[in-house]
């Protein structure tokens, strides 16, 4: 949160929002933007209409992403007090709950991606023969498929468990959702890579399903919390629970 430079200033007529947000999901197609801004000594959330005066939306550089991204610039955007979500300066707990939900959703997407990639690889390796036997019956290929299934099912179970826990305590589940997101997205990279390898040159065809999965798997380790950042938080929680508590 310390890196947020968007600010909200209270005036006699309401609020003035200034700053910018980069790589915002669905920028340009959304009707409203939920915006986090520094207000006083804390942080607040605001619901900003897309057509409000002073708000400029422009596309981000083209990147590998599952949805449209863009930049929002708030140039002295005037808002009523009623646009604030919750109490002034009390957005932190809402942010934690939102991050928890988003990270679980990314973990779920990674599980679905693994499922699709593995099904594609199994179909190919069962139908294509080499030296008189299906590829799936050759030891090296069978190992790729088996390890991928192991990654898929362990990620699926952790994601389901985390979602069930979040339903009861969304605000206190961030570390667990971070663990699910880290586990599933890292596994997705391994699984899709193995699937490409098992399919040989057929896994390298541009425009194929497996090529699409390969492209989609990589950014999952970056958005909604990069893997390296998640590891720091997870390790900190682990030390508190199992270490000396500091």
Pin down the residues of each PLM region.
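Short glycine/proline-enriched turns and hinge-like loops at secondary-structure junctions
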Residues: 1-2, 26-31, 66
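Alpha-helical interface subdomain recognition
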Residues: 1, 10-15, 73, 97-246
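Long, acidic (Asp/Glu-rich), low-complexity accessory segments flanking structured domains
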Residues: 76-94
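Beta-sandwich/jelly-roll carbohydrate-recognition scaffolds of carbohydrate-active enzymes
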Residues: 5-7
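A short core secondary-structure module
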Residues: 18-57
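Active-site PLP-lysine loop of aminotransferase-like
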Residues: 21, 63-64, 103, 181
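Flexible, small-/acidic-enriched active-site or ligand-binding loops
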Residues: 3, 51-80
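Short beta-strand-to-turn element immediately C-terminal to the catalytic PLP-Schiff-base lysine
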Residues: 9, 35-38, 47-49, 73-75, ...
């Amino acid at each position: 949160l310390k890196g947020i430079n968007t600010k909200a200033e209270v005036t006699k007529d309401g609020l003035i929002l200034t700053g910018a947000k980069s790589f915002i999901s669905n920028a340009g197609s959304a009707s409203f933007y939920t915006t986090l801004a520094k207000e006083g000594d804390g942080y607040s959330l605001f619901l900003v209409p897309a057509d409000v005066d002073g708000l400029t939306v422009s596309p981000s550089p083209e990147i590998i992403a599952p949805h449209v991204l863009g930049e929002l610039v708030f140039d002295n955007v005037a808002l009523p007090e009623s646009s604030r979500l919750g109490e002034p300066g009390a957005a932190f707990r809402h942010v934690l709950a939102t991050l928890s939900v988003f990270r679980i959703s990314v973990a779920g997407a990674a599980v679905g991606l693994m499922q699709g990639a593995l099904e594609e690889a199994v179909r190919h390796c069962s139908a294509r023969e080499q030296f008189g036997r299906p590829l799936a019956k050759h030891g090296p290929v069978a190992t790729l498929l088996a390890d991928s299934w192991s990654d898929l099912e362990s990620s699926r179970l952790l994601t389901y468990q985390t979602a069930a826990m979040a339903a009861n305590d969304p605000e206190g589940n961030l570390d667990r959702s971070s663990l699910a997101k880290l586990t599933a997205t890292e596994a997705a990279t391994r699984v899709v890579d193995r699937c490409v390898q098992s399919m040989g040159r057929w896994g390298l065809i541009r425009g194929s399903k497996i090529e699409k999965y390969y492209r989609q798997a990589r950014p999952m380790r970056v958005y909604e919390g990069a893997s390296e950042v998640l590891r720091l938080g997870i390790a900190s929680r682990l030390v508190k629970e199992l270490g000396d508590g500091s």
